[in-house]
Amino acid sequence: MRMKKTVAVIGAGNVGEHVASLILLKNLANVKMFDLPRKTEEKVFEPVKGKALDMKQMLAAMDIDARVEGYTVTPEGEGYEPLEGSDIVVITAGFPRRPGMSREDLLEANIRIISVIADRIKRYAPDAIVIVVTNPVDVMTYVAYKLLNFPKNRVMGMAGVLDSARFKTFISEELMVSPKDIHAYVIGGHGDEMVPLISISNVGGIPLKDLLPKEKLEKIIERTRFGGGEIVNLMGTSAYYAPAAAIVDMIEALVQNSKRILPCSVYLDGEAGEYYGVQGFCVGVPVKLGSNGVEEIIKVPMIEEEREMWRRSVESVKKTVEVAEGILSAGSSRQ
């Protein structure tokens, strides 16, 4: 019987805690959660330990034989020693964008967080596969890749799996068919410039463009692009059920060595980079996921209209990467 893998989840907020609970409910792996304390004037709370205890009792109630622990850490990086032995590390920790905060402010704040976490992963889990969720995800995946100095197959970002799930949801609602029978990919940067690949999307083998008129497809694409914002406007907070499920989809492929083809943000260079017109940064493309991480980058065909959308998406990510490079350089020169 093979040893159960261990997944570390850094950041046990809405997304992180749902990732942990889904992993446990599917009995995919043991889980370690890491998060900051919550301080009030009267008391210092350790919510991550409380969540882990709650999940232990959930497992007992459901007769699931898995382990979960919660560890309180500091912003400076103390308390990460239990990362040791983790096979997969998921980074969900990060600041959301707040009113009055520029994109550069957000970048700088989250680069600081990723820098501390990357250092601790290198120290305690040097053989782990790392999944980055912190936004802006393509840029933070690149930052993590550069700071970790891991082989590129072991660092990836979650974006396209979620965007593709949203795309499939809206197609499913429009056509009144099961999402299981819809094959559709969204690639590119995780943002307004994402690229839904209509030309290769199909429902039960029938091309999507033969089932929906262009104007309806355009509305679905627009809704997909702003799918996260739609949820924020309804709930007053970011989505977490679907992002968590998308992350667990990736984890399942890694743990079970299932060779799934999933769109992930990965570092592109060489032959694959030449095909996609990207050299030296991370952006979302279909990849084969297995026990070694990213085992192959799939070269997906695109029609000219999609190629143009792809170029715009890549350019948008590249500009933000350049800003991040400046922040990283400034940070290293201060040390």
From Swiss-Prot:
InterPro entries: L-lactate/malate_DH, Lactate/malate_DH_C, Lactate/malate_DH_N, Lactate_DH/Glyco_Ohase_4_C, Malate_DH_type3, NAD(P)-bd_dom_sf. This is Malate dehydrogenase 1. The active site is at 190 (proton acceptor). Substrate binds at residues 97, 103, 135, 166. One of its GO terms (cellular component) is cytoplasm. GO terms for molecular function: L-malate dehydrogenase (NAD+) activity. It holds the Pfam family Ldh_1_N. It is an enzyme of class 1 (oxidoreductase). It comes from Aquifex aeolicus (strain VF5). CDD domains: LDH-like_MDH. The keyword Oxidoreductase applies. HAMAP family: Malate_dehydrog_3. GO terms for biological process: carboxylic acid metabolic process; tricarboxylic acid cycle. Transmembrane segments: none annotated. Belongs to the LDH/MDH superfamily. MDH type 3 family. Catalyzes the reversible oxidation of malate to oxaloacetate. Its EC number is 1.1.1.37. Keywords: NAD, Oxidoreductase, Tricarboxylic acid cycle. The gene is mdh1. NAD(+) binds at residues 11-16, 35, 110, 133-135. It catalyses: (S)-malate + NAD(+) = oxaloacetate + NADH + H(+).
